[in-house]
From Swiss-Prot:
Keywords: Ribonucleoprotein, Ribosomal protein. This protein is located at the 30S-50S ribosomal subunit interface and may play a role in the structure and function of the aminoacyl-tRNA binding site. One of its GO terms (molecular function) is structural constituent of ribosome. It holds the Pfam family Ribosomal_L19. Belongs to the bacterial ribosomal protein bL19 family. It comes from Syntrophotalea carbinolica (strain DSM 2380 / NBRC 103641 / GraBd1) (Pelobacter carbinolicus). NCBIfam families: rplS_bact (TIGR01024). GO terms for cellular component: cytosolic large ribosomal subunit. One of its GO terms (biological process) is translation. The lineage of its organism: Bacteria, Pseudomonadati, Thermodesulfobacteriota, Desulfuromonadia, Desulfuromonadales. This is Large ribosomal subunit protein bL19.
Amino acid sequence: MNIIDRLEMEQMKKDIPAFKAGDTLRVHVKIVEGDKRRIQVFQGVCIKRHNKGLGSTFTVRKISDGMGVERVFPLHSPNIDKIEVMMVGRVRRAKLYYLRKLQGKAARIREKRSL
């Protein structure tokens, strides 16, 4: 392991829950407006996850006022307060780009049931 890998390992967050594409997430993001700070919650379906060490990202999609909104979050960003997994989805793909074309009930994802 070289110096760069060691520095990246130190900066990675340890409290990230296990999630994948298809899961419904609630992401708490720190927002700074002037001298005020607040937490904004973004809830939606994870449509993709890109794992590459410190540069890992995930994309969350939600429907807001009839418009699809997608937001890309860096996984190890200090601006992310916490990530909550609300529902584990049952999908057969790693990238759910097909959800962009679907509307209404067709865009629903089945819930994975545990026995």
